Amino acid sequence: VLLGLMLVWVAQACAQDVAQVAVPDQYNVRQFGTAGDGKTDDTAAFQKALDAAGKAGGGIVYAPRGNYFFAGHLNVPNAVTLAGVWQSVPAHNGIRDRGMPKPTDDGTTFLVTEGAGSEDGPAFVTLNTDSTLKGAVLYYPQQNADDEPKPYPWAIAMRGKNPAVLAVEMLNPYNGIDAMHNERHLIRDVQGQPIRRGIMVDDIYDIGRIENVHFNPWWSNRPKLFQWQMNNGEAFIFARSDWQYVFNTFCFGYKVGYKFTKSNRGVCNGNFLGIGADDCQTALVVEDSAPFGLLITNGEFVSFHGPDPTMIEVMQSNKGSVRFVNCAYWGPCNQIARIAGTGTVGFSDCTFVQWGGKEGNRPAIQAQSGTVMIRGCEFRQDRPQIQLGKDVRRAIIAENIFAGSQRIDNQSGGNVQIGQNVADGQSSPVPSGDK
């Protein structure tokens, strides 16, 4: 009986081996000579496995539990997935918090070392058409948690069509994801503490998607490192992107949380739902935007540190349209929004909790120029609510609720409509500039 059972087991094992050979779509990096000991350079072995999968027409290159040291960089061929053990993005804040998991304690961890001292150079992982990075931790062991950061190239670059980053922890890259020059990128379930830049989007002509991304100082909040990040870091940067979709994203502790800028390729338009920025010197900056707009809904913005903590800043260079709907703004900032440019900015059904600066006399929303719409919003402090500068071309301020008295300073020479606002106290007289 025992001999019979052994023969059955051997037969099953052989059948499994035959099946693997017959369908060579999965490649274990251990079979290509990786050490996974955190010391031996595994770059060449990983690339050999990736190239084998690419030559076969695609497949999954699997990196089992281990600490894989890289002195170089990787290129993931078309239709190849580089996958670690994680099915959901993990958390490793043990370097910051004693007793919690460290990045080398478990799972699949890539120790990245190439390019220290310069942002120039290839990304650690370059994804191409239909290729994916999934289920791994990227950790830069030579970055000092107690000092100003050393520059590195991008951790991940996304190229071609439909590249994807799924369930990846970028614990402490200098630059996170370069999502430029591709079509239909997908970034989902990504967490970590990118220090200088989190995600950069540009040169996108077919819809990119970013979902469930959370940047927080889990690796280090020590004064020298974290203050540098607060003075220099930008979490999400968008330049030319047509129909960008962003959903459920959050960042903490940056100079700018969300930045919309203009590159030589153009500007961004898109749908931004459930986005958040906490303890950023400026939560959201618009340098320029498309005429068909940035549609921002259910946002949560908090600013209270820095030389002039401001939730929203729309720059003089903006010519496009920006809409904030059902957003909340709190934290002892100086101002909720400072608006310039020739574009249109609208706030609808928003809640403004704190503003005014130390003296309490700065308006929540200060528009210097352009077109402004503020409708159905709640101002929860008895402080100056709105100031319209002389270069404001058009404005509608209607159906808002004010704590205390209405304090609207209208210096505009343009067409301004103010009405149907409700205040606790007697409304202040509307200046003669109301037209």
Functional labels for PLM-detected ranges:
Residues 28-29, 82, 418:
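Bulky hydrophobic/aromatic "packing anchor" residues in well-ordered structure
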Residues 29-64:
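Acidic Gly/Asp/Thr-rich repetitive segments characteristic of extracellular carbohydrate-active
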Residues 117, 135, 139-435:
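Extracellular beta-rich repeat passengers
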